[in-house]
Amino acid sequence: MFNQSYLNVYFICGTSDVPSHRTIHEVLEAALKAGITLFQFREKGESALKGNDKLVLAKELQHLCHQYDVPFIVNDDVSLAKEINADGIHVGQDDAKVKEIAQYFTDKIIGLSISDLDEYAKSDLTHVDYIGVGPIYPTPSKHDAHIPVGPEMIATFKEMNPQLPIVAIGGINTNNVAPIVEAGANGISVISAISKSENIEKTVNRFKDFFNN
């Protein structure tokens, strides 16, 4: 069952997102201990794990999340999400159609990326629990990212559909969260702000402060 508070501090990570001196397990556990509210396993890039290696890692990270009662979401990979019985899946505009995914994930969390008004207009949100809007700011984590849309896009979507849960993504750090919250976002999703933080506990707690009012 989806709760929009899951979106508050939403951590996204894969093996290519962590510094060389740390493992993804260490980074995720530190983030979980600090209080992230949702985790998305996003294994992308030239060095991304595939096949059984990816499956094994996904199961290990899922187990970690469940020890802390944090939902485990898979990015894009429908077959992996089904195989490990993930808590949900997040897809982009070019990935599998949401309607088809909903057949397999009737009681799971489904998230959809939307970058602009055109994508919003052509998206079927019937089975979608939340949308990921961005990139809000320029981001180094996604080489194929769209032009930054700014917090204003969140405000626009909230005006169009006040009940739709929205998580912001793209270039977010502890210094630029305030305009996102003011625009009406239910949470922020970050990659490098947490994965490359020198003090993950401090970073996560600063993010949490924006949503604990």
From Swiss-Prot:
Keyword rRNA processing among UniProt keywords: no
GO cellular component: cytoplasm
Source organism, top-level taxon: Bacteria
GO terms for biological process, alphabetical: thiamine biosynthetic process; thiamine diphosphate biosynthetic process
Top-level EC class: transferase
Residues the record lists as binding Mg(2+): D76, D95
Record text on cofactor binding: Binds 1 Mg(2+) ion per subunit.
Name of the featured protein: Thiamine-phosphate synthase
Organismal lineage: Bacteria, Bacillati, Bacillota, Bacilli, Bacillales
